[in-house]
Design a protein with these regions (language model features):
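Conserved AMP-binding
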Residues: 1, 51, 104
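Alpha-helix capping/helix-boundary segments
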Residues: 1-2, 28, 107
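Short beta-turn/strand-loop junction motif enriched in small, turn-promoting residues
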Residues: 2, 10, 87-90
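Activation segment
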Residues: 5-6, 32, 93, 111
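Gly/Ser/Thr-rich phosphate-binding loop
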Residues: 6-68, 81
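AMP-dependent adenylate-forming
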Residues: 42-46, 61-116
């Protein structure tokens, strides 16, 4: 939607009054970030969240001339914990690959109707 917002407002001053912009559910590519920064200097919040949780379990805040962090999903949102675990559900050391697990009140307890 950030892409659509920027495209719809191209060549206008419609976005000039924005103080904060939140986007999530899409990859913040270097090109999209550059388009945003070339148009606005406002604070940009980029959120990450898996479908099993919510639109945002973590976020990155880009203020002023902050550079885009290529591989970061940011810090956990309040009341949320994020863990990288191995196949045996044990935490892995920093820099070691694993599966991302989220915990906290934003996480659903399961499906209303479990998939078949």
């Amino acid at each position: 939607m950030l892409d659509v917002l920027l495209e719809m407002a191209r060549g206008t001053t419609k976005l000039d009054g924005l103080g904060h912009v939140w986007c999530g559910g899409e990859v913040l590519t270097p090109e999209l970030f550059e388009r945003f920064r070339s148009r606005l200097t406002t604070t940009l919040y980029h959120g990450y969240g898996p479908a099993e949780a919510t639109i945002g379990v973590s976020h990155v805040i880009y203020r002023d001339n902050a550079e885009r962090i290529a591989t970061s999903i940011g810090r956990p949102n309040p009341s949320t914990q994020l863990y990288v675990l191995d196949d045996d559900l044990r935490p892995v050391p920093v820099g070691v690959g694993g599966e991302l697990y989220a915990a906290g009140f934003l996480l659903g307890r399961g499906y209303v109707t479990p998939p078949v």
